[in-house]
UniProtKB/Swiss-Prot annotation:
One of its GO terms (cellular component) is plasma membrane. InterPro entries: Membr_insert_effic_factor_YidD. Belongs to the UPF0161 family. Could be involved in insertion of integral membrane proteins into the membrane. It is a peripheral membrane protein. Its main location: membrane. Coiled coil: none annotated. It is found in: Cell inner membrane. It comes from Aquifex aeolicus (strain VF5). The keyword Membrane applies. This is Putative membrane protein insertion efficiency factor.
């Protein structure tokens, strides 16, 4: 399961993400954060952390460096 999620996230980074303008307010980017979180915490907890990270990636939050 973990490898399937990681393949999807890497596919997103390589093929889908370049179609949108770069707008992530954090370093590392949200998709890189998701990959790191899934590798560190497993699929369920990693995706939950990534979900809340994406919710924070908006003009109301300052952004900055945020590692999982």
């Amino acid at each position: 399961m973990k490898s399937i999620v990681l393949i999807f996230l890497k596919f997103w980074q390589k093929f889908i993400s370049p179609l949108y303008p770069s707008s992530c307010r954090y370093y590392p980017t949200c998709s890189t954060y998701a990959i790191m979180a899934v590798e560190k915490y497993g699929v369920l907890k990693g995706l939950i952390k990534a979900f809340f990270r994406v919710l924070r990636c908006n003009p109301f939050f300052k952004g900055g460096v945020d590692y999982p």
